[in-house]
């Protein structure tokens, strides 16, 4: 039975731990927590790129989710944990890649949950993926809610399967009495995107005039500020053993390109590539690259195109009614992302791209 949160450290001055703080969602979450006056610890790997947390007033702990003992120092004395870290990818990859996905996402979550329970670190909010939420097999565009079970017998990506297994680890822990909540994230758009993310790269390439064509489809997109708010709501109001879906808006690719054009001043591409043709090209190129050049970035993967063609919608009524979640707009999220890539990363080099609008 779902219960209210009962953290073991009552002091409001006790820190919270954020894993994956150097990533897109993690960086946005850390900035928001610091703005709220929360004492923040971050768990990062020493070999990772950690530009996102440079200069921030956080306690740094170095560890690896695959090594349970390395997590304990960061967890001691915490009053809550945001487990955001994950290996995200839309490729099938080779055997080594699939093993890495499993060890980082599934085994890593299991280790984190066990170490948090043993350290009495309070509630753990785990970032879930909308890709691991089920859908109507006969009509995938029907809105999916938290009750819809992931169907593993359809063609799915290793990442999708791993996030479904991550949820299983959460429910196993909750069944043993641990305080765990899952905050489900959709396609993320916003600032503090240092790596950058797939959507961030697409926006930068668009602004730099490198996006020549597009594929039809659509997906649920979430603004960084909305998914961050969702995590905080899960920590403060969520029911243990439950998951909540957070999305800002469903948008077609054509609608996203309209927003890109408005924000950047660069005309959208007129050429539309048929999805079937793009799928054939993506299958062939992904097979070759995954086996012979696994580190080469792939923009249009078979998995990404398949997801876009499903045109999946999300039902966020549970988060809105139980937690008071109020989504903003994807237009604002694109503006936030563009401002970050233009002003902070200096990644927009096209002289025809207009400067971002100033806030306020």
Model-derived regions, located:
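N-terminal Rossmann NAD(P)H-binding glycine-rich loop of SDR-like oxidoreductase domains
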Residues: 14-36
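Conserved catalytic-site region of short-chain dehydrogenase/reductase
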Residues: 90, 129-141, 188-192, 197
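A conserved pocket-lining segment of Rossmann-fold NAD(P)-dependent short-chain dehydrogenase/reductase
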Residues: 93, 150-154, 201-222, 226
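Conserved Rossmann-fold NAD(P)-dependent oxidoreductase catalytic core, especially the SDR/UDP-sugar
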Residues: 103-159
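Substrate-positioning beta->alpha
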Residues: 111, 165, 198, 215-235, ...
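Mid/C-terminal beta-alpha module of Rossmann-like enzyme folds, strongest
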Residues: 230-298, 316, 321, 331-360
